[in-house]
Regions:
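A short helix-loop-beta-strand connector motif used in the catalytic cores of GNAT acetyltransferases and
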Residues: 42-62, 119-123
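Conserved beta-hairpin
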Residues: 55-71, 130
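Conserved beta-strand-loop-alpha-helix junction that forms the acyl-donor binding cleft
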Residues: 125-134, 158-167, 185-187, 194-196
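A short beta-loop-alpha structural element at the N-terminal edge
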Residues: 3-17, 21
Length: 198
């Protein structure tokens, strides 16, 4: 299994590029973003800004030893973005979503409203592996780095999946679907919860 560690600050642009590539075919992100050319140009900057603003120093930005994938984990009690964190991704959001920025922000806010408040838990905000490296255990390593810790500390973990094909992958790691929902005319999403293993 790949070795997992915290990303360094200078690696965050590569984290952003890998996550943008990983989510390029994601139904929800495709629904929110206005076209492939804009995605390829703007999404790496958005993911880099999100990782920097919301997870460095607050949660954990985990990468594998060869920088093939990344997981953005929010620590217990820090899953909701602060006003400052939101402001730090405002310009990258405008660049990525363009005229659809307000709709995208409403959609992300509606997803946030489904987030459980209790009990205390780690939140897997984003997990992605560059498509050229998927299927080699990178995603599993990035998940178990935190879920193993959750098991040791008696903490739960939570995520939202925006792709149905990924639901069985998360289930293999102990996550259980809580709800399937649609946001307006968008594609379905799944909320998933994992209780700690004894």
């Amino acid at each position: 299994m790949p070795t997992v560690r915290l990303a360094t600050h200078h690696e965050l642009p590569q984290v952003g590029a890998n996550l943008a590539a990983a989510f390029a075919d994601d139904p929800v992100w495709n629904h929110l973003s206005p076209g492939t050319a804009r995605w390829d140009k703007r999404a790496p900057g958005w993911f880099t800004a999100d990782a920097t603003a919301r997870h460095v120093g607050i949660g954990e930005v985990l990468v594998d030893d060869q920088l093939r994938g990344a997981a953005l984990w929010a620590a217990p009690g820090h899953w909701r973005p602060t006003l400052r964190e939101t402001a730090r991704v405002a310009l990258p959001s405008l660049r990525l979503f363009g005229v659809g920025t307000v709709t995208a922000m409403r959609t992300l806010s509606a997803v946030e409203k489904r987030h459980p408040r209790d009990p205390e838990h780690w939140y897997l905000a984003i997990l992605g592996t560059h498509p050229a490296h998927q299927g080699h255990g990178v995603g599993s390593a990035l998940i178990t780095a935190i879920t193993d810790r959750c098991d040791e500390q008696g903490l739960a973990s939570y995520l939202e999946s925006s792709k149905e094909a990924n639901v069985p992958f998360y289930e293999r790691h102990g996550f259980v679907v809580q709800e399937t929902f649609r946001l307006g005319d968008g594609p379905p999403m799944w909320t998933m919860w994992r209780d700690p293993k004894a």
